[in-house]
Amino acid sequence: MKRLTCFFICFFLSEVSGFEIPINGLSEFVDYEDLVELAPGKFQLVAENRRYQRSLPGESEEMMEEVDQVTLYSYKVQSTITSRMATTMIQSKVVNNSPQPQNVVFDVQIPKGAFISNFSMTVDGKTFRSSIKEKTVGRALYAQARAKGKTAGLVRSSALDMENFRTEVNVLPGAKVQFELHYQEVKWRKLGSYEHRIYLQPGRLAKHLEVDVWVIEPQGLRFLHVPDTFEGHFDGVPVISKGQQKAHVSFKPTVAQQRICPNCRETAVDGELVVLYDVKREEKAGELEVFNGYFVHFFAPDNLDPIPKNILFVIDVSGSMWGVKMKQTVEAMKTILDDLRAEDHFSVIDFNQNIRTWRNDLISATKTQVADAKRYIEKIQPSGGTNINEALLRAIFILNEANNLGLLDPNSVSLIILVSDGDPTVGELKLSKIQKNVKENIQDNISLFSLGMGFDVDYDFLKRLSNENHGIAQRIYGNQDTSSQLKKFYNQVSTPLLRNVQFNYPHTSVTDVTQNNFHNYFGGSEIVVAGKFDPAKLDQIESVITATSANTQLVLETLAQMDDLQDFLSKDKHADPDFTRKLWAYLTINQLLAERSLAPTAAAKRRITRSILQMSLDHHIVTPLTSLVIENEAGDERMLADAPPQDPSCCSGALYYGSKVVPDSTPSWANPSPTPVISMLAQGSQVLESTPPPHVMRVENDPHFIIYLPKSQKNICFNIDSEPGKILNLVSDPESGIVVNGQLVGAKKPNNGKLSTYFGKLGFYFQSEDIKIEISTETITLSHGSSTFSLSWSDTAQVTNQRVQISVKKEKVVTITLDKEMSFSVLLHRVWKKHPVNVDFLGIYIPPTNKFSPKAHGLIGQFMQEPKIHIFNERPGKDPEKPEASMEVKGQKLIITRGLQKDYRTDLVFGTDVTCWFVHNSGKGFIDGHYKDYFVPQLYSFLKRP
C-alpha cells in the first residue's frame, strides 16, 4: 500500500495481559463537545461501559451504538529549519473512550536519511523516555524487561524517500496516550530549491490539528512557496508569513475543514505538506557560518557557463526490464537525449547477456544524432540475462580511448549513468570482482552514477560502485512514476559548472573538516562542508576554494567572524543555536557510513565503526549501529526500535560523495601571484603590508587623470569634462591587441551648475586571447568566446584564463594581470546610497612599466612613450596655495597650476595627497588633439587615429 495510515485503531476484546491503567470515565482532555464536533449526531454522554438508546422513526426496536472507540484529540507538527538543518517534532494525543481495551498505533512517516533523536510516550501520566544504545546493548536491555502489550520499531517503507516509525500500545478504557517523536535532517538543494516534506496522515479527524514550519536563513530568502498537494481541498488554509531572512508556514485546518465531505467522518488530511524555498547568494565563495565552535560552509555558485560533458548511458535491457520498466525507461531516455547540449558528446550502451552500442565512440549531440539515438532506443526489446561487468568495462573503454587520443575537450567532464534492475546473472557474477574491475580500469576524470531500479538490485553494491568512482547511487522505484524519477535525476547532473572543487581552511585550529574535495559541482545543487575550531584560538575563519570552470581556474576567498550569527540567532526564539553542531555531526556520520562500506580491510572497518558508534551516542541519534531504547521511569518496561539496514547513500539526498584533503593542500596555481600594484589579501586582512609602487598613471573622480612621467619625475594632471554615456579610450594598442576604455556616468544632479561625470564602467579587451572584461560598480564579467563568468564586488576571488588573471578584493579593488608583466588596477568608490548628488564610480591605475608597443595610444596609452617637458617660470597664482608655471610640451607652451590630487590605493576612503601640475581645458596641448578625438563607439573598440 503506497501510503500507510498514521493512526490505525484495531478493535478487539483483548485478553492480553498488557500495560493496563484502569481509570474512571474519559480523559480530562476530552470533553463532550470535542466528541460531538468530531462525530456530530453520534454521541450522548453516558457513564463508563454503559450504552445509550436512540429511537429511529418507524422502528420499535432499539438501536444500540457505542461511543467512538478512540479519539485523536491533538495532532501537532513543529518543524524548524535553521540554515538547512531541519528539526521536526510530531506529537499526538489519543484517548480510548471505549469501554474495552484498545490497541493504539502511532505510525508516522519520516524522510529516509533523517536521524531520530528522541521519542517519548506518556500513558495516562506514566512517561516512557528514550535513550540511544549500541545495538547489542539495547537488545540486552530490552530482553531484560520487555514491555507487555507494547512494541516499537523503524520499518523500511517501499514508498519513495520515506520510512515508518511505528509504536503500538494496548490501553485500558478511558486511558490517554501522548506520543512525541523528534528527528533531524539536512535540506539538500536540488534543481534550484530546498524541499521540506512533512507527511500528514493522522488517519482520523483531530480536534486540534496544527502544523508550524519556521524557516530561518541568515543568507536571506530568495523565495518560499507552499504548493497545493491536497488537490485544492485546503485552498487558503496554509498561512505564509515571509520576511527577509525568516518565514513561518502555518497549517491549522478546523475539524470542518478536515472532513473529506461536509457530513463525512473521514479526514482529508492524507498526504504531504511541502515547503519549497531558496536563499539569496551574493558571494561566489559561498556562505561561511560560524557558531559555538563549529562552522558550516554552503557553496552554490550560479551564473556560470555549463561545462561540456561526455556522457555514456548504460541501460539494462535484460528480461526483467520487460513491460512498464522498459517503457518508462525509453520514455525518459527520449526526453534526456533531447536535453543534451550541442557541445556535449554521448553514446548509448544497452546490455543483457550481450553488449550492444549505438555508436562505438562518442558522438556530438547534434539534432540528427540525437534523433538517430532515440530511434535506436525505441527498438530495444528486453530479453536474456544481465552482464553488468562487461557493460561497464565497455563504457569505460570508450571514454578512456577518447581521452587518450585527445578527442575530448580538456575542460569537459565525463559521466557514466548506469540503469539496472537486478544483480548480474551472466559473465562475472562476483560483485566484489566487478567493483575491482571497474576501479582498476576507470580513469580518475570519470564519474559513475548508478540508478538501481526496484528492489531486486543489490543497492549496497551500486552505492559502493559509485561512491568509489566520484558518483552516487540512487534507487529508482519501479512504478508508473519511473520515467519522471529518471528524468529528475538526469536533470540534477545535466549541468556541470565546476570541476575539481576543493575547500581549504588554512589554520591549524580548524579540525575535523568533513569531505572537502569534490570531483564536480552541478548547477542547481549545493556543496556543504563543515568542521570544528577552537574559539579560544580563533576570532575568524578563512576559506579558500579552488575550482575550474568551463575555461577558467578560480580561487574564491571568504572570511567569517566568530560573532557574526550571535545577534541574529538570539533575536529569534525558533532559531536553533545548535544547528552548526548538528549539521557537522549529520555530515560526518553519513560520510563515515559511506567510508565504512568501502573500507579496504577489516581493521579499517572496525576503526570507522567505533567512530560512528561514538558519534551516534555523543549526539543522541539513531543510526544503523544504534538502537532506540524506550523505557519507563522504573526501568522495568522497555521497548526497542532498531534502525533498518542503511539504504541511502552518503548524506541521503546529497548529490556529492567527495574525499578529504589536508587543509593546506591548495593547488600551486591557486597561490595569488604578486602584482606590481596591490597585494590581494583575504577579506578582513590588513591591506598593503608592502607599499605599492609610488608612481602610476591613474584616473579618479570627475575624471581626474594623473600622468606620471618617470624621466621628468613629474605628475601631470588634467580633467575631462564630457557627457554621461560617452566612452573614452584610455589605452589602444593594436600591435599588442590590448584595449582599455571607460564609460562615463553622471552625478544625480548638477552641483553649482556643473554635472560631474565619473567612470561607471571599464572595458578591457585582450585580442589575442579573445578575452573581454567588463567592470562596473556592480559586477566583474569575463567573456571568452561564447562563455562568460561573473563575479560581484562582494566576492574575494582570483580567476585565471590563459594568460589573463583577475583578482578581486571584496568591495575594494580588481587587479588584472597579463603574463605577470602587465597590470591594471580598478578601485571601487562607494558613496552613501541616499547622497543627493554623488554616485558610485571607478578609478583605474596603470603602471608606466607596462610593456605596451610603440603604437600604443589613448588618453593614457600615448604617455607610455614619455614626451619631453620643460617646466619653468614658476610664480604665484590667483590662489596663493596654487602657484602657476609655464610648461613646454609637444611644441606648445601651456599655463599650468600646481595643486593636490588624491591617490586612493592605500586609503580608499580619504586618499593620499599627490602633488601634480594641472593642465586646463581638458588637457588641451598636453594630449594629442582634442579629448573628443578619444570617443569610441563600443566598450571594446580600438581607437581609430586620424
Swiss-Prot record:
Residues 1-18 form the signal peptide. GO terms for molecular function: endopeptidase inhibitor activity; hyaluronic acid binding; serine-type endopeptidase inhibitor activity. Glycans are attached at residues 118, 445, 666, 673, 675, 691. Keywords: Disulfide bond, Gamma-carboxyglutamic acid, Glycoprotein, Phosphoprotein, Protease inhibitor, Proteoglycan, Secreted, Serine protease inhibitor, Signal. Plasma. Its main location: secreted. Residues 19-54, 703-946 form a propeptide. Residues 665-679 are annotated as: O-glycosylated at three sites. It is found in: Secreted. Residues 308-468 form the VWFA domain. Heavy chains are linked to bikunin via chondroitin 4-sulfate esterified to the alpha-carboxyl of the C-terminal aspartate after propeptide cleavage. Residues 56-185 form the VIT domain. Disulfide bonds join 261-264, 650-651. I-alpha-I plasma protease inhibitors are assembled from one or two heavy chains (HC) and one light chain, bikunin. Inter-alpha-inhibitor (I-alpha-I) is composed of ITIH1/HC1, ITIH2/HC2 and bikunin. May act as a carrier of hyaluronan in serum or as a binding protein between hyaluronan and other matrix protein, including those on cell surfaces in tissues to regulate the localization, synthesis and degradation of hyaluronan which are essential to cells undergoing biological processes. This is Inter-alpha-trypsin inhibitor heavy chain H2. It comes from Homo sapiens. The gene is ITIH2.
